[in-house]
């Protein structure tokens, strides 16, 4: 997938349309400060927990201080989930990796703080 591509090759055309509709809805909810209630409506508590865990997986993989097996023990995630995160991170566009580094690896910067 190229950095500017909106389509996910892993999804069908219809699923891509649904995905892009969700992304647009999420963007609008953020603009109107409704993202938390929207995500609570659309995602189960387990799904919200899983997303939080995936963010931590990406953060720790970028930090590079733990092996995938150590991450499995530390985060309680399956090795397949960690491996998928690692492979996705390797395939991510450089601009996204740089942005994630700024967001996730800045020790004093809380998530969501764009200042």
UniProtKB/Swiss-Prot annotation:
Keyword DNA-binding: yes
Residue stretches in coiled coil: none
One Pfam family, short name: Trp_repressor
Subcellular localization(s) per the UniProt record: Cytoplasm
Gene3D superfamilies: TrpR-like (1.10.1270.10)
Entry keywords, A to Z: Cytoplasm, DNA-binding, Repressor, Transcription, Transcription regulation
Family to which this protein belongs: Belongs to the TrpR family.
Name assigned to this protein: Trp operon repressor
Gene that encodes it: trpR
